[in-house]
């Protein structure tokens, strides 16, 4: 049997670190997930071992808080954008070897604290759904730059099936996603 729960009861939210592009490099101490790069090459997942595009680095002299370090299965969430349509993009962070990685400016880390109730991959799909994004947008503030505060996201209630069902749903959605990616790649080859 599932349950209805507020995100803030099962997740913590942390703001990313502000590092300008001029201080990003091809090599360094930490991988750095820059907000602008999320829209150009990543879709639902950020796989550190096999990234869709190169991930830049920052040096160890940057002022980084421990809360800005990404952990495997965190969700990198976009809560600031120049358009309302770009709010609410979610990216599951896959980093099984725990390479040191920092979440960047204008991103929010969503960390699942209750994995006995929530499968991070399931939550990532849920947070990417049109229904969730509609709910999220009711909290939008701003005129030129649009924002949603993490405390507002924490108030959003979600229905959770049992974790076994969440795993089954993720397996189905992952298979569909993989097929879509393969088709996109094939279409890219055909149009070239």
Residue positions per predicted region:
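Short aromatic-glycine-enriched beta-strand elements
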Residues: 29
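Short glycine-enriched loops at secondary-structure junctions
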Residues: 38-39, 96, 141-142
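Sequence-specific dsDNA recognition surfaces
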Residues: 8-25, 37-82
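Non-catalytic DNA-recognition/assembly elements of restriction-modification systems
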Residues: 1-18, 155-192
């Amino acid at each position: 049997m599932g349950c209805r729960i507020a995100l803030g009861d099962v997740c913590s939210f942390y703001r990313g670190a502000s590092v300008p592009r001029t201080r990003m490099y091809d090599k360094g101490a930490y991988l750095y997930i820059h907000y602008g790069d999320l829209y150009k090459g990543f879709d639902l997942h950020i796989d550190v071992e096999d990234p869709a595009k190169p991930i830049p680095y920052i040096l160890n002299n940057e002022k980084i808080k421990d809360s800005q370090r990404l952990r495997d299965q965190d969700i990198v969430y976009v809560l600031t954008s120049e358009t309302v349509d770009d709010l609410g993009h979610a990216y599951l962070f896959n980093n099984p070897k725990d390479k040191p990685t920092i979440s960047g400016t204008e991103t929010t880390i969503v960390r699942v604290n209750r994995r006995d109730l929530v499968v991070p991959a399931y939550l990532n799909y849920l947070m990417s759904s049109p229904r969730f994004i509609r709910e999220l947008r009711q909290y939008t503030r701003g005129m030129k730059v649009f924002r949603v505060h993490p405390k507002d996201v924490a108030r959003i209630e979600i229905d959770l099936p049992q974790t076994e069902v969440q795993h089954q749903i993720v397996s189905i959605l992952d298979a569909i996603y993989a097929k879509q990616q393969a088709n996109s790649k094939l279409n890219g080859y055909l149009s070239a």
